[in-house]
């Protein structure tokens, strides 16, 4: 069976890197490539709409004004899952541009399908490693905000190094934010919430908007996600953090 464009995307979510002597350089990933298959519908959505809703990884910064056709602030969301809440936010905020990153191709296909259904035009999606996109494809000072909702908690202590929220990640994000740009995170794992708070609070370029110096109630503009609903059913709390760049 001939592989389509959508089938190929899963194989190119990150670029290979090698040591000086030519050996493959292993990376500490914050994600796992799941083996879920694209449905025929999701595949068709990706193949038919990538030209208008998709972006490919590149080694030079994106020209957001050209991509979106305006100078509205760009909000980046990393790990949007199936994309429903991301599309809903884009639909509700036409004065903002949204850029979503997800390595799971069925999620990318589902997000595109829902965006087409809603008629959303201020959204683009990428199927690639977010750390490489931040490093290579986004210029400093060009993001209005970052959203990171319910990232993989890597709950075992030996796997905490795989959590995406680390000091070097936050430093990288801050470089990409414009003045007064925001970082909004949410998790239903208390231990991860504590780590997020510690890492974000330690960076002197950020200000916590919480009146108590820790977490905020879920704001109305963040849709209730299936992960949050799942957490409620399991008796988990949910913690939102909202910091602003000085």
Swiss-Prot record:
It catalyses: guanosine(46) in tRNA + S-adenosyl-L-methionine = N(7)-methylguanosine(46) in tRNA + S-adenosyl-L-homocysteine. Pathway: tRNA modification; N(7)-methylguanine-tRNA biosynthesis. Pfam families: Methyltransf_4. Its EC number is 2.1.1.33. GO terms for cellular component: tRNA methyltransferase complex. The keyword S-adenosyl-L-methionine applies. Gene3D superfamilies: Vaccinia Virus protein VP39. This is tRNA (guanine-N(7)-)-methyltransferase. It comes from Haemophilus influenzae (strain PittGG).
């Amino acid at each position: 069976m001939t592989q389509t464009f959508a089938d190929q995307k899963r194989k190119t979510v990150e670029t290979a890197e090698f040591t000086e002597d030519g050996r493959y350089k292993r990376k500490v990933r914050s994600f796992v490539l799941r083996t879920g298959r694209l449905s025929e519908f999701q595949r068709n959505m990706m193949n038919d709409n990538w030209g208008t809703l998709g972006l490919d990884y590149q080694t030079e910064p994106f020209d957001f004004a050209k991509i979106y056709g305006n100078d509205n602030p760009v909000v980046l969301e990393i790990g949007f899952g199936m994309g429903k809440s991301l599309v809903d936010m884009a639909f509700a905020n036409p004065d903002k541009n949204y850029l979503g990153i997800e390595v799971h191709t069925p999620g990318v296909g589902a997000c595109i399908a829902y965006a087409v259904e809603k008629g959303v035009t201020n959204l683009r999606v990428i199927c690639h490693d977010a750390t490489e996109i931040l490093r290579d494809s986004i210029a400093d000072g060009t993001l209005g905000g970052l959203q990171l909702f319910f990232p993989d908690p890597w709950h075992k202590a030996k796997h905490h190094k795989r959590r995406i929220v680390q000091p070097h990640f936050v430093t990288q994000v801050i470089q990409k934010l414009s003045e007064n740009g925001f970082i909004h995170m949410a998790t239903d794992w208390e231990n991860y919430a504590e780590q997020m708070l510690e890492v974000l609070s330690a960076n002197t370029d950020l200000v916590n908007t919480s009146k108590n110096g820790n977490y905020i109630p879920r704001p109305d503009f963040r849709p209730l996600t299936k992960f949050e609903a799942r957490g409620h059913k399991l008796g988990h709390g949910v913690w939102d953090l909202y910091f602003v760049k000085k």
